[in-house]
Amino acid sequence: MSTWKDLTAELDLWAEAGDVATFWWRDDDAVGPTPALDRLLDLRRKSGVPVAIAVIPANAQPALGDVLSGDGIDILQHGYAHRNHRDGTGKKAELGDDRALWDIARELADGRGRMFDIFGEDGWTETMVPPWNRIDEPVTALLPGLGFHGLSTFRAREAVQPAPGLTAVNTHIDIVDWDGDRGYAGDQATLSAAIAHLSAKRGGLADRGEATGLLTHHLAHDDACWAFIDAFIDVTTGHPAAQWASARALFPVPR
C-alpha cells in the first residue's frame, strides 16, 4: 500500500540522482463562478502553485474572464460542450472519429472563438483538453490547423508531439473515484499513481521530460479531495527534488 512516506522516498531517489521531478496541476469542467471554484483559487493563492483550468466554452459564463484573471492561473479549452456523441456501447467521447470531422472542427473553432471572447487574445493557453480525456487520431491531427499548440489527456504520453506543432503533456493522478462513489479515490490509488509515474520516468520507462500531472475536478470534490490536494502540494513543495510548472511553460507557443 502506497503511503506519503513512499512518495517522499521516491522524491528522495530523484534527489540522490541529482534531478528534479516536475509537476503540474490541471483542473477540469469550469463553466462559471462557484464556491468550489473560489475554494480552488484560494488554495492556489495560499500554496503559490500554478493551476491550469480547463473551461467548457459552450457553457462558459462571461464572468469567468474576471474570476480567472489572477496570477498563477492558465486557461485551457475543454472540448466544446462536453457532450457525449457515442452510442451507449462505447466509452463517452466528444472528440471521436465516429463523427464527421467537419462537424468537430466547426465546434472546436466556435469554442476557440468563445474563449477569445471571454479571455482575450493573450488570456488563455491554446491547449485542447478533450472531454473524458478521449480524442481519436484524426481529430488530433486537426488541432494545429485550428490554432491549437497543446493537447492534454490522461496517462503517460506516447509522443511529445502527437501531431506537428502540437505538444502533449498529460495528467497522471486522478483524485476522483469515478467508477465508485465519485468521491475521493483514496490515498492508495492517488499516491500509487503519482509514485508509478515518477518511478517510470526515473527508470527510463516513461518520458522523463513529461511533467507529472495532478488532475482535479473542483465541482466534484468532497472534503477528502480537498485535503489530498492540500497535502500533496505541501509534500511536494517542501521537497528539494520537486518543482511545479505552469501550463504556459509546458505548452510553448511555436515560433
Where are the predicted features?
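Active-site beta->alpha N-cap acidic-glycine motif
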Residues: 2-74, 124-125, 214
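Alpha-helical scaffolding within the catalytic cores
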Residues: 7-10, 59-69, 152-171, 189-202
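C-terminal domain-boundary segment and adjacent tail
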Residues: 9, 13-18, 150-155, 206-255
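Active-site beta-loop-alpha junctions enriched in small/polar residues
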Residues: 30, 56-58, 80-82, 156, ...
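Metal-dependent polysaccharide deacetylase catalytic core of the NodB/CE4 family, i.e.
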Residues: 50-141, 173-179, 214
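His/Asp/Glu-enriched short active-site or ligand-binding loop at hydrolase and phosphoryl-transfer sites
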Residues: 144-187, 244-248
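A conserved mid-domain beta-alpha-beta active-site/ligand-binding segment of alpha/beta enzyme cores
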Residues: 168-219, 224
